[in-house]
C-alpha cells in the first residue's frame, strides 16, 4: 500500500507568539478566542506551551504591546526571559521582567537603553 509522506509544520514568529500577520490588527490572545474554527483548538496551544522549555525568547515590541511598561509588578516565576529590544521598553518594563524572571537577558544595540539604569541580581551582562 502506498502511503503519502506528510510533515506537520507550525509557523510561529521569532518572538514565540502565534502570528496573525505583520500588523497589530489582530491579537492572538484576545481575538482568536472569538473566531470559530480557531477558538476550539486554541487551548491545545496553551497546554503545549506550558510543557516547553523554561526559557522564553520575545521582543520588547510585543511586551510593550502587552502593557508591561505600565503593569503592576508580577510574582517571580521559574521562567527565564531573553528580550530583544532597542526602544520599546521603558525602565518600568525592564524592572517588570527583572521581577518576573528567574534570569533576565536583554539584547540591545542601544547604548542608552533604560535597562542600563536598572540593577538586579538576576540580570546577565556581558561586555
PLM regions and their residue ranges:
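Histidine/lysine/aspartate-rich catalytic loop segments that bind and position anionic ligands
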Residues: 101-127
